[in-house]
């Protein structure tokens, strides 16, 4: 095989694959197509999740309530023993 070039080896390998794997090629192509559809749907989902996260950070997609929070403010005296350390 000293006289064979790279492109000739590629053609021989492709012919061998077609000869020995011909019955399996439709199933392999179907699986490849299904994998590509799953991959593209996952990429699309990641993009929409990324946009949602960006909206939450910017405040446009905020779900915070407009109602005030109940509680009380506590001011400690300077004489409080818990503040002295």
Swiss-Prot record:
The chain crosses the membrane at residues 1-21. Residues 44-58, 69-85 have a biased composition (Basic and acidic residues). InterPro entries: TatA/B/E, TatA/E. This is Sec-independent protein translocase protein TatA. It is a single-pass membrane protein. One of its GO terms (molecular function) is protein transmembrane transporter activity. One of its GO terms (biological process) is protein transport by the Tat complex. Residues 43-85 are annotated as: Disordered. The Tat system comprises two distinct complexes: a TatABC complex, containing multiple copies of TatA, TatB and TatC subunits, and a separate TatA complex, containing only TatA subunits. Substrates initially bind to the TatABC complex, which probably triggers association of the separate TatA complex to form the active translocon. Part of the twin-arginine translocation (Tat) system that transports large folded proteins containing a characteristic twin-arginine motif in their signal peptide across membranes. TatA could form the protein-conducting channel of the Tat system. Belongs to the TatA/E family. The keyword Cell membrane applies. It comes from Micrococcus luteus (strain ATCC 4698 / DSM 20030 / JCM 1464 / CCM 169 / CCUG 5858 / IAM 1056 / NBRC 3333 / NCIMB 9278 / NCTC 2665 / VKM Ac-2230). The keyword Endoplasmic reticulum does not apply. GO terms for cellular component: TAT protein transport complex. It is found in: Cell membrane. It comes from the Bacteria. Keywords: Cell membrane, Membrane, Protein transport, Translocation, Transmembrane, Transmembrane helix, Transport.
